[in-house]
From Swiss-Prot:
Keyword Ribonucleoprotein: yes
InterPro entries in the cross-refs: Ribosomal_bL28/bL31-like_sf (IPR034704), Ribosomal_bL31 (IPR002150), Ribosomal_bL31_B (IPR027493), Ribosomal_bL31_sf (IPR042105)
Pfam family, one: Ribosomal_L31
Tagged with keyword Ribosomal protein: yes
Biological processes, Gene Ontology terms: translation
Family: Belongs to the bacterial ribosomal protein bL31 family. Type B subfamily.
GO molecular function terms listed in the Swiss-Prot or TrEMBL record: structural constituent of ribosome
Domain of life: Bacteria
Protein name per its UniProtKB record: Large ribosomal subunit protein bL31B
Classification via HAMAP family: Ribosomal_bL31_2
Source organism: Salinispora arenicola (strain CNS-205)
Keywords of this entry: Ribonucleoprotein, Ribosomal protein
One cellular component (GO) term of this entry: ribosome
């Protein structure tokens, strides 16, 4: 590999504030904010809006979508209004 062209790969904490959940991993992401982790070291922290701790699929709190109603609404909106002509 060529030196000096790759971003720095280092430990980073990702934090999901909505679920009060954080995890330490390695990444090239950068951040001005830092956090002291449970091991006593200070790491850059990246705030995320959603993670496995707050995503509806993983938490089991899914929101069901009325797919049948949406299909009927689509068909009503784009239904042809008259006999179809073949070209």
């Amino acid at each position: 590999m060529r030196r000096g062209i790759h971003p720095e790969y280092r430990p980073v904490v990702y934090r999901d504030r909505a679920a009060d959940f954080a995890f330490l991993t390695r990444s090239t992401a950068t951040s001005e904010q830092t956090i002291e982790w449970t091991d006593g070291n200070t790491y850059p922290v990246v705030d995320v809006q959603i993670s496995s701790a707050s995503h509806p699929f993983w938490t089991g709190r899914q929101r069901l979508v009325d797919a049948a109603g949406r299909v009927e609404k689509f068909r009503a909106k784009y239904a042809r209004r008259g006999p179809q002509r073949h070209r």
